[in-house]
Design a protein with these regions (language model features):
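Active-site-adjacent structural elements that line small-molecule/cofactor binding pockets in enzymes
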Residues: 1-317
Length: 317
């Protein structure tokens, strides 16, 4: 398993994200994930820059591969526009770009006032959107008339030498089967060996990528407080992450999440062995590339500590 760094667009502004990308490269991380949001999950996180602009900055600051973790190409932004943005990102990174896609959350997609579809319809829309992406990346003038989208005489003039790989996220059986069908890889946030096996059994041959969060700090008690203050939404059950429409709603729901609940799944504090245990859960589940996000302000401490102690265990070759 390779170890990458997960850039949190919800927690940092664009200049800080570019700086973290630079630090991640210096520390030996394999590649980058970057989240694509219109809103953060709560006001405490406090950021949400336009990911496509940030990717341009990262491309100039580093030589790392960047994957959106993940983009919704179905509601807020038409898939023809995502195809254009992704093609430009692949050109400016000289091919070091992957487009991670998923069926999205109302938190980000409701802002244009469109109806928020049910889960099954969202997957149907995602499948058609990926069809449009691949069509436009073929080059030339293209049109598409489908159930959910129309494209009229569209041509992307600046195309990379090879189309970007599409990494499809999914957390349930239907989404994972779709990922195996239409994707060049699969993205998840859970070290669930059964679901990863399902992806493989359904014919998924590309890499399984995953994202996880840690709060590395010299003070475990302070790290627990930081993780709970900034990311309580990670513990919300069921489909709440997909259907709650605003940061205020997430803040209300997160009042039910205790500090202990967050600390059960987010390793907090200075114990490197505890952090490695979490990483190994993903490796043992069959994850090929794991992207780690450091929660909170102690970014320098994280990179300085992980670069010599943890990163070489995974990225030495």
């Amino acid at each position: 398993m390779k170890l990458g760094y997960f850039l949190s667009s919800e927690e940092w502004g664009p200049r800080e994200l570019v700086d973290q990308a630079r630090r991640a490269e210096q520390a030996g991380f394999h590649a980058l994930w970057i989240s694509d949001h219109y809103h953060p999950w709560n006001d405490e996180q406090g950021h949400s820059p336009f990911v496509w602009s940030t990717i341009g900055g990262i491309a100039e600051a580093t030589n790392m591969r960047v994957t959106t973790g993940v983009t919704c190409p179905t509601v807020r932004i038409h898939p023809a526009v995502i195809a254009h943005a992704a093609a430009t990102s692949a050109v400016i990174t000289q091919g070091r770009f992957q487009l991670g896609v998923g069926s999205g959350e109302a938190l980000n997609e409701h802002v244009i006032g469109a109806r928020w579809p049910e889960a099954e319809e969202r997957l149907e829309m995602l499948e058609e959107a990926v069809e449009i992406l691949r069509l436009l990346w073929q080059g030339g003038v293209k049109s598409h008339r489908g159930r959910h989208y129309r494209v009229e005489n569209a041509r992307i003039y600046d195309l990379p030498e090879q189309p970007p790989e599409i990494i499809v996220s999914g957390f349930g059986p239907k989404a994972i089967k779709l990922a195996a069908k239409i994707g060049d890889g699969h993205a998840t946030t859970s070290p669930d060996a059964d679901l990863i096996k399902l992806y493989r059994d359904q014919g998924g041959k590309g890499p399984v990528q995953a994202g996880t969060k840690v709060c590395f700090s010299r003070d475990e008690a302070e790290a627990r407080k930081t993780a709970h203050r900034i990311w309580p939404n990670e513990q919300l059950p069921g489909e709440l992450a997909q259907v709650l429409p605003t940061p205020a709603h997430f803040e209300q729901a997160s009042e039910l999440v205790s500090e202990d609940m967050v600390a059960e799944t987010v390793p907090c504090g200075p114990d490197l062995d505890r952090h490695v245990e979490t990483l190994e859960e993903y490796a043992n589940a069959g994850v090929d590339e794991l992207f780690v996000q450091q929660i909170g302000p102690e970014q320098d401490l994280f990179f300085d500590s992980w670069a010599p102690e943890i990163v070489p265990r995974y990225n030495s070759d």
